[in-house]
Amino acid sequence: MSRNYLYLITLIFIITSCGGGGGGGGGSSEPPVAAPTVSISLSSSSIVLGESVTINWSSSNATGCTATGSWSGSKATSGTETLTPSGVGFFNYGISCSGSGGSRSSSVGLEVYRQTDGVSVDGYIRGAEIFIDKNNNFTVDVGDENSTTSDNDGKFTIKYDDGNLISLGGIDLDTGNPLDNFLINQNLSGYSEFKVITPVTSVASFLNDSTSINNVLGIDSSIDVFTFDPVANKGDGGINDYLYEKGNQLTILAFSLQNIINNINVTTETTQDYFKSIAEEIDLEYETTSQKVDIETSNFVLNVLNNIT
């Protein structure tokens, strides 16, 4: 009996030493819960106002999602929706998904912008560089400013921005003459679907009050010179032809002065300084007389030339 008892004690000792009595080797822990993954994308990163964009999102290890940023509400763990933003600007669309393993978020950006159509006019000017100058240096800053080229009818479509809408160079369709360094512009004071760039809008941009352009040049008050196409509407023998003729007179004056000064100084200056000088002289004469200014008189031309030199 004592020998059997000794065997039993020895067996218990061996079992205990091997961990058989309930040590750590016999148990198991549960695996960690996987965290969610989330992805979101747009069919386009930029659209014109009024267009739509498709948004797609998906997730894994998630039980529910919530839209954040420029959209809102509870969302399925994956899906597709069509969005039509109601305004312009930069929008951020986010999605946050959660599950037993926590939550994850992702987002994507969208630019919504307007476009404006327009025409470059002396006669119509084809092949002109059209751009929106945002820093008033009268040159296009590639990559920072919107630009395009006028087509064979002088027309263009450009991404709208605040600034100075400029037409530079090109070919005059009425005469076939190249317009080297011929720069005309319109200061953009607000969005409209159609803009014209003409010698008249160029002078207006340099007046003390651009809205006085009709009064100072005697243009009929019913004409909006910033949206009215003087070429398309000429031929009535009346107010439309008068507007067209004023544009031609301003072109001849500014272009002639530019060529004279460039030849004297051996430079390649564009016409904006000459339109500016014309506007300054118009302001001076109108402030004195409160009458429309005759830009064809020799005194007017000499005063403009003196302002430049």
Task: Map each language-model feature to its residues.
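Feature for extracytoplasmic/surface-facing segments of secreted or surface-associated proteins
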Residues: G25-A34, E111-T309
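Solvent-exposed segments in extracellular or luminal domains encompassing
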Residues: K75-N92
